Amino acid sequence: MSALTWAVAAVVTDPSGRVLLCRQSGGGRRWALPGGRLRRDESPPAAARREIRAETGWEVELVDLVGLYRLGDPAAPPPRAGHCGALPDVLVHVFRARVLGDAPAGTAAGGCHLDWHPPDALPEALTPTTRTAVADALAGRSGVLREPAHHLPPGQRAAGEVGTTRP
């Protein structure tokens, strides 16, 4: 079993309801939510604000926690040094957030192309977790717990959620 990696991400919206997505310059070049790993002794909300500010330049208000999303395969062996391998076991805290202000407060880190997308016109090249988390956030869900399909008991759907919808 691999060590669990704790991460954060946020479905960041602007006043018109568009969603901020980041397209990494390497890898499969899919769009994802802004976010990153927690630092030692850092709370998930503090990490989310820090990562979003560093990656996008925007200051945000965290509205609430959409849910926890588990990625990867904890049973997968670690990759050999210098080689790609299975995604490590990652637990992502996904928040719902709003931008503060009319423009970024700082400079975005390199390596990420940022763009705003209307919720009804999201790009096709989204990571599966991003697609699911955005749908959950825009539907007003909170307290969602999601795992990849290969971690679920037989007969349980991968798209099923535990949680509530905000009034």
Q: Predicted regions: what is each one?
A:
Residues 135-167:
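Charged phosphate-binding loop/patch that engages nucleotide di/tri-phosphates or the phosphate backbone
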